[in-house]
Amino acid sequence: MSGSSLRRVAVFGATGSIGASALDVIARHPERLRASVLSAGSKVDALLALCVLHRPAHAVIADAALYPALRDGLRAAGLTTQAHAGDQALDALAASDACDTVVAAIVGAAGLSSTLAAAAAGKRLLLANKESLVLAGELLTRTAAAAGAEIIPIDSEHSAIFQCLRSCDASRGVRRVILTASGGPFRGRQRAQLAEVTPAQAVAHPKWSMGPKISVDSATLMNKGLEVIEAHHLFGLPGEQIDVLVHPQSLVHSLVEFVDGSTLAQLGLPDMRTTLAVGLAWPERVESGVGGLDLLQQGRLDFEAPDTEAFPCLRLAWDALRAGGTAPAILNAANEVAVSAFLQGKVGFLAIPALVEHTLTTLQRQNADTLNALLFADAEARRTTERALAHHSLHA
């Protein structure tokens, strides 16, 4: 990107933590970045406040019932921002000339349609929505390749691998990639100690500032399992070439080991603004607001193997990747339902992997060659998991 060209950025999921980080970086570079489209699910007041601050051309509220509040709020603020509502508006704006870059930060399967629309339109796609790759990885990467869209991952682990691989023309010389995991707030606990974990404890992540769903996924290690599946799609690697190490300091974000014996790692403070700055300016580097890494002050870097007995979600994700087809979509949908039930206090922490495993073993995998097949598998997995919630034997 030349210094004179203005990159118009759509931030989908603008009111979430990733959206806030993206807008922070964008605001630091008004000469080269502009937030042209902002979207939110139902937080209309927060979206209006962001519109006043960033003055986008378009604002979208996913909940159509809130459209009048958005429209009237924009008018009352004296803004020329055009109001839209619903998923179809998101898809249309993702594909339109209102933006050339899309930050896909809508949590869950709800973000899939607009992500695919951006890919099909050949946009630069800053992908923070894990579920798009887990649910429809083959479809998304195929769509992006056909349209010439550029997918730049935003989560720290895949951004690290992206940066290591792009630093040299050596993608075919990769022996393995190693994703690092903080281990979450319950690292070191035995399985029996996890039964009494509360939602408040699970969302208190030791290193990263994240939303509640992804915080729980980090606590169960499902987050890392989803990232294994993501890495498979993003970098074309089989599961056997993707490893996971627990690294509690969260300073080494991932490593790439090459066939010549060398290993490249990307290090930095745990702050999403770094990876967003990489995606927004690549191949250039711009200031993100994040300080440098002081290794003397940090002191030490520790690594250990993940405990898949206490945290079986990581193993379940590898199982789903090996099974292929709709299995990852089933895994993801079951997990979304289970985590939601846990956050509402309906089930215990250990019910999350139990429910996911139940659904994964109950439903047969199918081919995943169309979006309809994937959405059907997603819906079927949600129904199966909801039914299983009634059985208290799974809730232990």
Swiss-Prot record:
InterPro entries in alphabetical order: DXP_reductoisomerase (IPR003821), DXP_reductoisomerase_C (IPR013644), DXP_reductoisomerase_N (IPR013512), DXPR_C (IPR026877), DXPR_C_sf (IPR036169), NAD(P)-bd_dom_sf (IPR036291)
Pfam families in UniProt: DXP_redisom_C (PF08436), DXP_reductoisom (PF02670), DXPR_C (PF13288)
Residue numbers binding 1-deoxy-D-xylulose 5-phosphate: 130, 156-157, 182, 205, 218, 223-224, 227
Binding locations of Mn(2+): 155, 157, 227
Keyword rRNA-binding (UniProt): no
EC top class named in words: oxidoreductase
Molecular-function GO terms, alphabetical: 1-deoxy-D-xylulose-5-phosphate reductoisomerase activity; manganese ion binding; NADPH binding
One of the protein's GO biological processes: isopentenyl diphosphate biosynthetic process, methylerythritol 4-phosphate pathway involved in terpenoid biosynthetic process
List of residues binding NADPH: 15-18, 41, 129, 131, 211
Substrates-to-products reaction catalysed: 2-C-methyl-D-erythritol 4-phosphate + NADP(+) = 1-deoxy-D-xylulose 5-phosphate + NADPH + H(+)
Known cofactor(s): Mg(2+); Mn(2+)
Keyword terms of this UniProt record: Isoprene biosynthesis, Manganese, Metal-binding, NADP, Oxidoreductase
Top-rank taxon: Bacteria
UniProt pathway: Isoprenoid biosynthesis; isopentenyl diphosphate biosynthesis via DXP pathway; isopentenyl diphosphate from 1-deoxy-D-xylulose 5-phosphate: step 1/6
EC number annotated for this UniProt entry: 1.1.1.267
Known role: Catalyzes the NADPH-dependent rearrangement and reduction of 1-deoxy-D-xylulose-5-phosphate (DXP) to 2-C-methyl-D-erythritol 4-phosphate (MEP).
Assigned protein family: Belongs to the DXR family.
Protein's name in the database: 1-deoxy-D-xylulose 5-phosphate reductoisomerase
Gene name, Swiss-Prot/TrEMBL: dxr
